[in-house]
Every structure is written in structure tokens, then in C-alpha cells.
Amino acid sequence: MAADDREDPAPHPAAARIVVDPSDREATVAALVAPGAWLREGKLVAFPTETVYGLGANALDAAAVERVFAVKGRPAFNPLIVHVESAERATAVARALSPLALRLAERFWPGPLTMVLPRRREVPDVVTGGLDTVGVRVPSHPVARLLIAAAGVPLAAPSANPFTQVSPTTAQHVFDQLGDRIDAVVDGGPTTVGIESTVVAVESGPDRGERLVLLRHGGVSRAQLEQAGFVVVEPAADEDEGAARRSPGRVERHYAPGVPLVGVGRRSDGKLELPAPQAPPPFAVLARGDGAGAEQAAACEVLPIDVEGFTRGLYAALHRIAASGCAVAYVERLPRDPAWRAVADRLRRAGLAD
């Protein structure tokens, strides 16, 4: 079914909010009984993972998954990632894991890594975009894993935001964007990684050997994969818009805050190199380490200088910039270093222009 053919669900009463403390396992298990039941019944429940908040639906319930697409305005060709409780449970949606996939799971699961694997026929086409593969992940966030256990079913869960907009890293982001269109939000506090999972296709055979095809940069870097002994290759280029994709997050326009983003550098005195028009419109700044030179900015977001800290805070900063009413946001250019590849990809797809 094409995205344009899906019924756009009308707003309904605000989603239920279930607040949990990830450090209190017993109380969290009790609090997740109800949302687990709602997921089995075909309802939509947003929940925290270590990467971003996901919009969960029973991955084996085609009608529930179709509602995810409708709520997000997501095109049908864009496959979803299925979240399972453990590597052993991956075979609920994927055929037997190859030795290469098992080694990868042992090293990086639970964690922010998605494997694209041959699907089982029980997985509805709507989950996979009609492909014969399915993306599978075991999240490391304790609330996510307890919710999957409470539901008793694998959860198809894209980011809990309208398609192409900034992903949510807090429960409030979800309420602001989808709160009147879904059934519940499990509030487990802010996420810790801050961007989506890395996606790899696991390939092995006499013609290709054993290798990982890196389809999306994310919470696990290429360097980490290679340091663990895996052979990693990348596609030459993204596939054409609208074509079937093996990975989500590869649409050219994505993660966008609705404000033009313009890259800027630093002057020799360390201040941001901002334009100085005669009558500047309200502008925002997104900088690393300090906001020197941005004294006239209507909104100034200063993130840590290290890649982990910057990544963790990026989407929250973009949400604040989107809400600031500024006409443009000047973004400090990132280091040209492989460690920054994932966050640079997000900013490029968000519309960052140099």
C-alpha cells in the first residue's frame, strides 16, 4: 500500500503517559504490564531506546504496522526495524542467523546495531517494504527490553516522529509531535546515544566472502566494526528516491527541523564566523564547545566538543531551534574525521548547506 493510500488517522485523546525509572526494575516491570497488553492488542506505544524514542507496534500484526506508517506519514517503501528482546528471539522474524551474524550479535548486541537478515514468511510485507530481508535489533535500553518482554511479541519501531522531521530523544518530543495520534508513551527519560542505530547487511558466500555492507551510519562506528575484526564495505551511492531500500534513514531529506541550516567556521580569534547583514533576521546558532561570536543570536545551542557528547545532544538542540522561531540556524562545521561520519550524515540530510 502506498503512503498516499493510507488513511490519515484523526487526532484522538492525548496518549497515556507511563513514567518509569530505568534503575528500578521491579517497578518498571509492573508499570509495563498495561502497555505490553496494548501492543498485543494492536495499539501503538512509543518507548525509549538507547538511540531515540521508537514508535512500537506488534511486528506480526499488519494492521498495527500500517497504522505506524499512517501516523508518521511514512512511505511504504521504507522498511521498519524490528526490535527483539535477545539474540535468541531474532529468529522469530529472521531465518537462522549465519555464523557471521552470530559473531556480530555476540559482539554488539544488545546495542545500537541493526542487522539486515533474511526474513521469515510470518513477517508482514508492510514491515519490510516487500523485501525478502528484515532489519533486526536488540536494544540495550532496559526499558525497551522489558517492554518487549511484557508485550510478548517483536516490536516494529521506527523513530516516534513525523516522517523526515527530527527524531525524538525525550518523551516530551514524542508528545509534542504525535501525542494526539498514538495510544501511549513510556517515559524513561532522555536517550543516551542520541542518534539512530547503525544498519548493516550481513552477507556471506563463496562469491563475496564474509562481509558487512554498511547501509546507515549510527551508534556503532565503522571503526568499531573493523576493530572487532569484521570486513566492512559501503554502497557506492544511495538508491533512487522511492525505490525499495534495505535500510531506513536513507531518504535524502530527513531529520529536518524546518529551519534552514547553514554551515560556518571559526575565525582566527576563535569566534564563530557569522554573517553580519544590515538588518539580520532572528537567527540561531549550533556550536561545539562555546558560542563565542554568537552574542546576537536569538537562540544559541552549545554542545560538547567530543563526538559522543555532541551526538547525544544534537536532536534535542535541533528541536529547540525548531521551536525558537528563528529564520535560519548557523551550524559550526564538524571535524572532517571518520568518527563524526554518523552525525555529519544526519546534519546533511537535515538540510545543512555549506
Name each model feature, range by range.
Residues 2-354:
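Active-site-adjacent structural elements in enzyme catalytic cores
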